[in-house]
Regions:
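Short consensus segments that form the blades of beta-propeller domains
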Residues: 139-146, 223-225, 334-339, 575-577
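Long, domain-scale functional regions
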Residues: 72-76, 203, 244-608
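Extracellular adhesion/glycan-binding regions together with long Ser/Thr-
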Residues: 23-26, 88-103, 162-217
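C-terminal, structured domain-capping segment
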Residues: 105-123, 128-134, 188-244
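Short, polar/proline-rich extracytoplasmic segments that appear immediately after membrane translocation
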Residues: 15-98, 224-245, 598-601
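Short, Lys/Arg-enriched N-terminal segments with co-localized hydrophobic residues
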Residues: 2-3, 7-21
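Surface-exposed interaction patch
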Residues: 42, 51-54, 97-178
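N-terminal segments of secreted, surface-exposed, or virion structural proteins that
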Residues: 80-135, 312, 317-319, 338-341, ...
Length: 608
């Protein structure tokens, strides 16, 4: 049993099972498992107070349904627990802070839909909050803060719908916000999210809603709240599902092209275009050759390249020693994700074989304010590129000492990404839509500081691990010539799991890699070797934090290996490989994948 000090009332903790309902309409069989998410808030102090903000729901809900009749589907709503407890020291008025929450915690509402094979099933639903009938109602019978001052707040993050709490908002009763008065059977109620949707082409589709509760210790007399209890529940209602023919839904790459004007409208850019960064109005899709055909890539301030695919299978922490763990090891660990969190991506480009290349973009859904630039929750944590930096080979995603293009040993960052992919996500599950693809780690080199050409960078007659200055291929293309390429110069640097159309080194354990500096420049940034730093904070790959690219820069003075990266200030640069930078994995969806949605922040692509 949890014990509290004299200033704290005990936490009321309880759990209620959901209710099961069956509905039959024409040929549709709809199985709906409806969960309830409980909130309990106990007040116990004069000035700032101790709050227990508790959300509970049975999450052991399971169902198997054979979808044989047209339109058969299962719709499941379940959740975990949010438990916000404020330490006694945070209650004192001398600790008041109107900007930083004294405590916060997050609960989850998980929605799962499985439709019938061959049919496009669409379910809409609302997410509502209802006070218990015997509870106090915050903001109706007791005073609340006014204006922008935050006290007891709710923030709701999810994939789509009209979300009234997408930004943190005081959770006070206010009929202008849509609150309804209590009745004899129901407490006061407000709709948090209206018209959220989930679609399925026969595969299981799900979305996680995050409900964040926060308590602010105010420099105000809050005696009127002392001893009050605010309890309620959050649940799904107004579930409406329909089915239609799903056989005409386009493949994913076709959908992307159609949503961006079609392949025929896309042009090829030149070094003149790449010599400058994009502006906020400079955006779209363009084309360029890659190793497998014609690639179509996003550039500039695009906001329609969002994808939700995959989930975390366990909690994940990034610790100060550059490792990841399922628990907080105490080594200055930062939590990256919770088990069950959705994974969001940004599409970089359609590859030449029509697979879809994407870069990791966190576990929170985009909002209107983050639809182009998302500056939080975009990295898998920090890692060195390689723990060692004193040999030329250490610029490699894999390397063999004594060889220019070796693949005998994994780099530090490859080990990090492989561990994440295989052990912390469901991306490696049977039936995954992730497919093999070429990830270029261009180690062609020159001993001269010259622009890139095959002659200049592919004709070394000897190789030295130390003592010789090397400039790598990406340096010659980007720094000297503003001529990025999506082709990879030699097969030994085309990192793949298996051969793809007779190309690739087959050295990878898992189909995951890093973005190249060429892709970053084509997306809208620019690297210049002049003293003038080009800054772009308006294109979709800007995150406000440093992260690695997978392109070698140079072996400086014959003693230190350097790799390209992106700086949080908005410019492309480089660091020695032993430095700790952000990690953003890159994967590719199969060319057979189908995407539902439009890719915008409130209609994110989902993968079928």
């Amino acid at each position: 049993m949890i014990k509290f000090n004299s200033r704290v009332q005990k936490l009321l903790y309880f759990l209620m099972n959901g209710e099961l309902s069956m509905k039959n309409k024409k040929s549709n069989t709809i199985l709906i498992i409806q969960g309830v998410l409980f909130i309990i808030l106990i007040i116990g102090a004069a000035y700032a107070y101790l709050g227990t903000f508790n959300i509970n729901l049975n999450n052991n809900v399971a169902v198997n349904i054979n979808s044989t009749s047209p339109g058969n589907l299962s719709f499941i709503a379940s959740s975990t627990q949010l438990n916000l407890q404020v330490p006694d020291t945070s209650m004192a008025q001398y600790n008041a802070n109107n900007n930083v929450a004294a405590a916060e915690d997050t609960g989850f509402v998980d929605i799962t839909l499985t439709g019938a094979e061959g049919f496009l099933t669409t379910c809409s639903y609302d997410l509502v909050y209802e006070y218990n009938t015997n509870s106090d109602i915050y903001g109706k019978t007791v005073p609340v803060t006014t204006g922008a001052t935050k006290e007891i707040t709710i923030e709701v993050n999810g994939m789509n719908g009209n979300n009234h709490f997408a930004t943190e908002t005081n959770f006070n009763f206010d009929t202008s916000k849509g609150w309804s008065n209590a009745t004899s059977s129901k407490g006061a109620k407000v709709t948090l999210v209206t018209g959220a949707t989930l679609k399925s082409l026969g595969s299981e589709q799900s979305v996680r809603w995050k409900v964040i509760g926060r308590y602010y210790n105010l420099d105000l007399n809050q005696y009127a709240l002392s001893g009050k209890s605010f309890t309620g529940k959050i649940y799904v209602e107004n579930v409406n599902c329909s089915s239609e023919d799903g056989t005409t839904v386009k493949k994913g790459y076709e959908t992307i092209l159609a949503n961006n004007g079609g392949a025929a409208s896309m042009t090829t850019l030149t070094s003149t275009d790449f010599a400058k960064v994009t502006t906020a109005s400079d955006k779209g899709m363009y084309k360029a050759p890659d190793d497998l055909g014609t690639s179509y890539y996003f550039r500039g301030a695009v906001d329609n390249n969002w994808v939700k695919y995959g989930k975390y299978t366990k909690d994940m922490y990034n610790c100060n020693n550059g490792t990841i763990s399922a628990t907080d090891t105490g080594n200055s660990c930062t939590k990256i994700a919770s088990s069950g969190d959705d994974i969001y991506w940004r599409i970089i480009r359609i590859n030449g074989d029509n697979s879809i290349r994407m870069i990791y973009s966190g576990v929170t859904a985009p909002t209107e304010s983050t639809k182009v630039i998302k500056t939080e929750d975009t990295s898998l944590g920090n890692s060195q590129f390689n723990a060692n930096s004193v040999k030329a080979e250490y610029v490699g995603y894999m390397f063999t000492v004594g060889q220019q293009h070796g693949t005998g040993t994994d780099s530090t960052i490859k080990t990090y990404l492989d561990n994440w992919y295989a052990n912390y996500t469901d991306l490696n599950k049977t039936g995954t839509k992730i497919t093999d693809q070429i990830y270029c780690n261009d180690r062609t080199s020159s001993t001269s500081d010259v622009a890139y050409s095959t002659t200049n960078y592919k004709t070394l007659t000897s190789w030295n691990s130390t003592g010789t200055q090397y400039y790598y291929g990406a340096y010659g293309r980007i720094a000297k010539d503003n001529n990025p390429m999506l082709t990879c110069a030699v097969d030994s640097d085309r990192f793949t799991v298996n051969k793809i159309n007779s190309k690739g080194n087959g050295a990878l354990n898992y189909p995951i890699g890093l973005i190249t500096i060429d892709e970053l420049e084509m997306a809208g940034n620019n690297f210049s070797e002049s003293n003038t730093i080009e800054i772009n904070t308006s294109y979709y790959l800007h995150t406000g934090v440093n992260y690695w690219a997978g392109s070698p820069h140079e072996f400086r003075d014959g003693v230190i290996a350097r790799e390209f990266d992106v700086y949080g200030d908005g410019y492309l640069y480089y660091d020695y490989v032993g430095y700790g930078n952000g990690v953003r994995g890159v994967v590719s969806l199969s060319s057979e994948s189908k995407l539902l949605g439009s890719g915008t922040y409130n209609d994110v692509y989902t993968v079928n």
